[in-house]
């Protein structure tokens, strides 16, 4: 009976291009204005559904339903997203419904689950059910980059008695596997052939496109060993050339079916 409201709220949240960027930090918005806007949108949904709302200095949104006893159980979702990247057939920030699917950046990861968490708790309110323990829906803002939102939250808030995230198939998936956030840097290569090389927008996304500029004329480039249909070579003049690789992007947690453009 509330499904259309759920879909409308997911669409409202998807409309915010909330890519976390600590370089655009401002008071109350440590990850930039677009993430703050998405957080305010989510908190507005929670308030409308009957939650008591607040936030941890813009790091984490907090939506509470009081319980009979001290302590609370919680869910945690996040309103930040990875960059949309190229290759979309639709506007990634205008949610569309197609053949039973919802299309848009963040529909699955993790704005849709965030909205569903809020509606799950709101069901208790709509039925006049007061839970034994309080229910808290946490709304993170930095899951895709560094999880600094959670660390900040725990500095001044008690841990829930129990918490799970709808950002996976709970309970089969119940923890982060971790990641390596290293950076490989090369010293300048004298007389090197590579002038520039670009590709990825985020460390946890498999890039769909990569571009390399070489100080080598097209006539001297070796023939591709594989995936020739995914490579485009064009001359730039003055003995230079550009190679454009077209892969199949995706989330790094689901590499099956993707083609890493950088590896091409």
Please place each PLM-identified region on the residue numbering.
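Predominant activation on well-ordered alpha-helical scaffold segments within soluble catalytic domains
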Residues: 11, 43, 115-122, 151, ...
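Short hydrophobic/aromatic beta-strand micro-patches
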Residues: 64, 140, 215
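Short secondary-structure junctions
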Residues: 18, 48-56, 97, 194, ...
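Hydrophobic residues embedded in beta-strands of well-ordered beta-sheets
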Residues: 61, 101-102, 241
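Midchain, well-structured core segments that form catalytic/ion-binding scaffolds
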Residues: 144, 150-264
């Amino acid at each position: 009976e509330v499904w259309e409201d759920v879909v409308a709220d997911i669409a409202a949240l998807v409309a915010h291009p909330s890519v976390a960027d600590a370089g655009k930090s401002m008071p109350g918005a440590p990850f930039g204005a677009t993430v703050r806007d998405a957080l305010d949108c989510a908190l507005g949904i929670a308030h409308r559904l009957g939650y008591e709302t607040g936030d941890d200095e813009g790091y984490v949104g907090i939506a509470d339903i009081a319980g009979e006893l001290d302590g609370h159980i919680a869910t945690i979702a996040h309103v930040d997203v990875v960059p949309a990247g190229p290759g979309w057939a639709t506007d990634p920030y205008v949610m569309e419904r197609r053949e039973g699917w919802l299309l848009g950046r963040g529909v699955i990861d993790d704005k849709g689950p965030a909205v569903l968490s809020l509606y799950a708790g709101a069901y208790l309110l709509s039925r006049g059910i007061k839970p034994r323990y309080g229910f808290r829906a946490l709304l993170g803002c930095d899951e895709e980059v560094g999880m600094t939102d959670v660390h900040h939250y725990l500095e001044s808030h008690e841990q829930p008695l129990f918490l799970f995230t709808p950002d996976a198939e709970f309970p089969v998936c119940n923890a982060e596997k971790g990641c390596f956030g290293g950076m490989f840097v090369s010293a300048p290569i004298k007389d090197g052939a590579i002038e520039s090389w670009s590709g990825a927008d985020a460390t946890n996304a498999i890039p769909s496109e990569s571009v390399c500029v070489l100080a080598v004329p097209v006539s001297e480039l070796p023939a591709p060993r594989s995936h020739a249909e995914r490579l485009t070579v064009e001359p730039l003049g003055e003995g230079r050339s550009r190679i454009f690789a077209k892969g199949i992007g995706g989330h790094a947690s689901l590499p099956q079916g993707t083609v890493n453009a950088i590896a091409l």
